[in-house]
């Protein structure tokens, strides 16, 4: 019985943690999903963004008490503007998506929403972490050795 409880806890922790991509695995996935050069944004910049926003973790969330919104997933897409979590006051849901969809191991929907974000005038500058850690920097290290 004790073994079953421990096994259950291990499986639950794996389910809660979600998928944490290896760097090159994510680079290949983003390239396959059309992110390299999308709206003039290099794959290395997308990788830098994902590193600093979520550390490549699909289940990352971050609550923002100021506007009562939450950032979701590998790109930390915000519930005030881009997705619907059913809790954020005045949410826009410009991606027309449930925020929970941004937490899936399959990042296809997260990529589609990130593409929607960068179509707005701010572009990739909508992400604070990108401005702080990636903008005007050599970001080639994020794809180095990945063959992409």
Curated annotation (Swiss-Prot):
Active site: 53, 71
GO biological process: defense response to Gram-negative bacterium; defense response to Gram-positive bacterium; killing of cells of another organism
Molecular function per GO: lysozyme activity
Record carries keyword Disulfide bond: yes
Keyword terms, alphabetized: Antimicrobial, Bacteriolytic enzyme, Disulfide bond, Glycosidase, Hydrolase, Secreted, Signal
Catalytic activity of the protein: Hydrolysis of (1->4)-beta-linkages between N-acetylmuramic acid and N-acetyl-D-glucosamine residues in a peptidoglycan and between N-acetyl-D-glucosamine residues in chitodextrins
Function recorded in the entry: Lysozymes have primarily a bacteriolytic function; those in tissues and body fluids are associated with the monocyte-macrophage system and enhance the activity of immunoagents.
Location of the C-type lysozyme domain: 19-148
Protein name (database record): Lysozyme C
Pfam families for this protein: Lys
Documented EC number(s): 3.2.1.17
Other facts: Lysozyme C is capable of both hydrolysis and transglycosylation; it also shows a slight esterase activity. It acts rapidly on both peptide-substituted and unsubstituted peptidoglycan, and slowly on chitin oligosaccharides.
Keyword Magnesium appears in the UniProt entry: no
Classification via SMART domains: LYZ1 (SM00263)
